[in-house]
Regions:
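Anionic coordination/interaction segments
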Residues: 1-285
Length: 285
């Protein structure tokens, strides 16, 4: 039988997947999610972005094409157990993992990784007929002791027009608007002024904290590889008004030996009819 294994992965014909066995590919290896109006690009290290219909004019999340290193902005999950911080897709913390696989399939990508007997399985997909990306993160304690740890989600919102978002810096610093309600973060930049659409980022579990200010989350001297909030283990509950806007949930989990917990994160787009946008003069829905 022909050996289909290559240096960085192999084709799984039975499951119609390409399985990547190392996160350190020569360049980002990207899958395309979505089929109708909502689309996402996702790399083998969870880099990428989402958009609704038009990648230039209706971009939900930021992606910097000339970043150093490559592919260092995406939809990330930081797992903090004690002093160990890692990501299911390796980036951006780049902590050495005990196991790693990325399965790029037809309309979905699944990441399977582990560190210190804590296993993570992350599946990202865009459901047919829905304007959102769903990420299911399942965590399993494979050790013989109870594990206490935190999960921090992270996306950076784009101010919709991708070209203006990356060029008009002076204006962009004063635009950002968010609202936070329980486990849902709403990105409403210019919704009151001139737009009828907004983005939201939510999770199916109560949160211990949140952040919507990138500066507060990363810290003055932090970075996406080393966010000060994650290393401190405490969110700021920041509500951004201007500046760079992000969505970050902080969840605290306890798993007994052999126990699993699934978290469902939804990043979505919503649009209202202009006549249905206002509850009363000056009050938006």
């Amino acid at each position: 039988m022909e050996d289909t294994h290559m240096k960085f992965g192999y084709f799984d014909d039975a499951n119609k997947e390409y399985v990547i066995t190392s996160p350190k590919t020569p360049l980002p290896w990207i899958n395309y999610l979505g089929s109708e109006n909502f689309f996402s690009l996702i790399s083998n290290t969870c880099g990428g972005y989402s958009f609704y219909k038009d990648a230039k004019l209706l971009r939900l999340t930021r992606y910097r094409y000339n970043n150093v290193p490559f592919d260092s902005n995406g939809h990330y999950y930081y797992i903090k157990e004690g002093d160990t911080i890692w990501n299911p897709g390796w980036m951006p913390a780049k902590t050495d993992l005990d196991a790693y696989e990325c399965h790029h399939g037809m309309g979905y990508s699944t990441f399977r990784s582990s560190k210190n007997d804590l296993q993570a399985e992350l599946t990202a997909f865009v459901p047919v007929g829905k304007n959102c990306e769903i990420n299911q993160l399942t965590l399993t304690n494979n050790s013989k002791e109870t594990k206490d740890f935190s999960v921090f989600s992270y996306v950076e919102f784009c101010f919709w027009n991708a070209v203006d978002d990356s060029t008009n810096f002076q204006r962009n610093l004063s635009l950002g608007e968010v609202e936070v309600e329980e486990s849902t973060i709403y990105h409403k930049t210019e919704y009151r002024e001139r737009r009828n659409h907004f983005a939201y980022y939510t999770v199916n579990s109560p949160v211990a904290g949140f952040d919507t200010s990138r500066d507060d989350f990363l810290g003055v001297y932090g970075s996406i590889e080393h966010p000060e909030t994650v290393y401190a283990g405490i969110s700021h509950n920041s509500v951004a008004s201007g500046g760079a806007v992000i969505g970050s949930h902080h969840l605290k989990l306890t798993l007994k030996p052999g126990e699993s917990k699934s978290l469902i994160f939804v990043l979505g787009y919503s649009e209202n009819d202009p006549e249905d946008k206002w509850e009363a003069p000056g009050i938006i829905k």
